[in-house]
Amino acid sequence: MIQEEFVSKILEVLSPMPDVTAIKSKGHIVLYKDGVMFGKIIEQNVLLLSNGNKFIEVESELIARILRPKNQLDQSDCDAFLFKVTKSWWLAKSKIWTISATKGFLENI
């Protein structure tokens, strides 16, 4: 599967999560939602932001299962992937809010 097809399929699986975009960067694709970066696609791998402020690779077995043809997809695999992505996005969003709130607080001192 070529990179464009892979990214397209990942975005299709993420379609229940509105406003997810993929933007090409140096050597990888960056995943954003509402202007917040929460993931990366490098070659055929999806990496999501973790609690440790690092991008952790989603299990290759799960990625392989969500890339199956539609008539062979198990909805629980799509749901598991969406859960991981949503968790990563909320984590990234909370970090941005914390940084901006702290900056705003410091500017008002």
Segments (PLM) and residue ranges:
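Charge-dense, helix-prone N-terminal extensions
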Residues: 1-109
